[in-house]
Amino acid sequence: MVEEICHICNDKSTGKHYGAISCDGCKGFFRRSIRKRYHYQCRFEQNCDVTKNKRNACRACRLQKCVKAGMKSNAIQNERDAIGKRKKTTGAEKEDLIDQLVAAETLCQQLRSSVIKNTSSLAPYDCGKVKWNYEDARAATLDDIGKSIHQQLVLFIEWAKSLPQFSFLAQADQAALLKGGAASIIVLGVAYRSICLTVENTICLANDTLLPKEHATQVGDINCVVGRIIDEIVNPMRRLNMDLIEYVALKAILFFNPVVREINDQSPVENARYAFLRSLQRRCTDKALENMEDESMDCRSGKLLLLLPSLQAIAQQLVEDVQLARLFGLVNVDSLMEELILNDMKPSDPQILQTSLASPVNSSVKAEVELEE
């Protein structure tokens, strides 16, 4: 007997729902979209790839595919929610949060690909399938490292601004979170981008230049940072086979840190972190069930959370290296890096962060993120 697949995302189907053969994920997505009367917009040309691993990337194209597959909105207009409110606030809430995070990450990748000329055409969801041409890949220079940090900072701000949990905060608390989490988020992003590499002991920067561990000594005193990123973050991620959903959840948990300096109202930050933590735990449970693994939810999510102390320690070392590089004139430390990485702005200096927070999402990316051809 041939097992049917979901006609929307090609995942394993659980039967016919609202008129189409689909999985529970697409069933729930369609139900929520119709009941809450969501109106989605595609940022591209309404032809995004909707597969099991990418179905959360574009909700407009996913809903469009649900309709094309045969799902009928009138099939749920008068349907009673037999699941009840309690279950709705667990599974449905978890997927809504994950949708937010994946959408925010997708936005960053879209912005990144529009400003970095050497960006691979593959999205982050294909990370495990990336095949690098190492003969053509360029080794990173010290200038690449400085530019990469700047570019990631700009995208980091836009990522944060796209999250509802962040936009509800007072601007002073937004700035405190950005300053407190910038270096850690940079380290996490570099590490996740590097797990797809098939070559050993190498990290991949935001502009797709490669920095092997043995080459790091030639581009300033960052050899230790590169080695620690590989040994303490990249290799454990590979062993755990971390996926995109786990990555975006861990990124949010790392970012919404209620104990960073200068936070005035910790409560909404704590609530956001706890919600994302629940999402990560549920994702780990789902993954264990999908793969029929004996590993418990707590065990897998615990292993992922154990990456956080190393991420923060490496981030602090990165900050110290940037300070030394600036002291010896090895790298151009611009105002954004001074404000977010070094937290070394004078009251009289222009506050780039304040301006960025006051502007709409994506309004300053084209002006801020530049790469010389």
UniProtKB/Swiss-Prot annotation:
Superkingdom assignment: Eukaryota
A Pfam family assignment: Hormone_recep
Subcellular localization(s) per the UniProt record: Nucleus
PANTHER family xref list: NUCLEAR HORMONE RECEPTOR
Function description: Orphan nuclear receptor which, in cooperation with R-SMAD daf-8, modulates the Insulin/IGF-1-like signaling (IIS) pathway, perhaps by regulating expression of the potassium channel exp-2, which in turn modulates the secretion of insulin-like peptide daf-28.
Encoding gene (name): nhr-69
UniProt GO cellular component terms: nucleus
Any GO BP annotation: regulation of transcription by RNA polymerase II
Subunit field text: Interacts with R-SMAD daf-8.
Knockout-associated phenotype: On a temperature-sensitive daf-7 mutant background, enhances entry of larvae into the developmentally arrested state known as dauer, and also suppresses exit from dauer. Up-regulates expression of the potassium channel exp-2.
Occurrences of domain NR LBD (ranges): 93-344
GO MF terms held by the record: nuclear receptor activity; RNA polymerase II cis-regulatory region sequence-specific DNA binding; SMAD binding; steroid hormone binding; zinc ion binding
Record feature DNA-binding region, as residue ranges: 3-78
Family affiliation: Belongs to the nuclear hormone receptor family.
Name the record gives this protein: Nuclear hormone receptor family member nhr-69
Keyword Transmembrane helix on entry: no
Keyword DNA-binding in annotation: yes
Entries under PROSITE patterns matching the protein: NR_LBD, NUCLEAR_REC_DBD_1, NUCLEAR_REC_DBD_2
SUPFAM superfamilies per UniProt: Glucocorticoid receptor-like (DNA-binding domain), Nuclear receptor ligand-binding domain
Keywords of this entry: DNA-binding, Metal-binding, Nucleus, Receptor, Transcription, Transcription regulation, Zinc, Zinc-finger
Primary location group: nucleus
Zn finger (NR C4-type) location: 6-26, 42-66
Organ and tissue specificity: Expressed in the ASI neurons, hypodermis, and in tail neurons.
